[in-house]
Amino acid sequence: MKFRPLGDRVLVKRVEEETKTKGGIIIPDTVKEKPQEGEVVAVGPGARNDKGDIVALDVKAGDRILFGKWSGTEVKVDGQDLLIMKESDVLGIVEA
């Protein structure tokens, strides 16, 4: 299934966190926090401004982003667990 977000929404795949600490301790799923970093899978066309013109988003597919702890709605697309959120929920782009 092909999924295209509407408006200023962004489809994000969470980046998996390490399951083991540097000291070798394995972190069980019950105490792990969900990662707040992800990769943008797809973006909508943008939000409309006061004049009705579409303003393109700052993020694009392939960007690695940081987002708030409670941001987005969890969805399942083609068997993958993804998040859909507004661009305003994105805190920033991680640059290499």
Curated annotation (Swiss-Prot):
Alphabetized UniProt keyword annotations: Chaperone, Cytoplasm
Pfam families, A to Z: Cpn10
Cellular location(s): Cytoplasm
Domain of life according to the entry: Bacteria
GO cellular component: cytoplasm
Predominant subcellular localization, coarse grouping: cytoplasm
Transmembrane segments: none
One Gene Ontology molecular-function label: unfolded protein binding
Swiss-Prot/TrEMBL GO biological process terms: chaperone cofactor-dependent protein refolding
PANTHER family per the UniProt record, alphabetical: 10 KDA HEAT SHOCK PROTEIN (PTHR10772), CO-CHAPERONIN GROES (PTHR10772:SF58)
Quaternary data: Heptamer of 7 subunits arranged in a ring. Interacts with the chaperonin GroEL.
Functional note: Together with the chaperonin GroEL, plays an essential role in assisting protein folding. The GroEL-GroES system forms a nano-cage that allows encapsulation of the non-native substrate proteins and provides a physical environment optimized to promote and accelerate protein folding. GroES binds to the apical surface of the GroEL ring, thereby capping the opening of the GroEL channel.
UniProt family annotation: Belongs to the GroES chaperonin family.
HAMAP family linked: CH10 (MF_00580)
Protein name: Co-chaperonin GroES
Organism phylogeny: Bacteria, Pseudomonadati, Pseudomonadota, Alphaproteobacteria, Caulobacterales
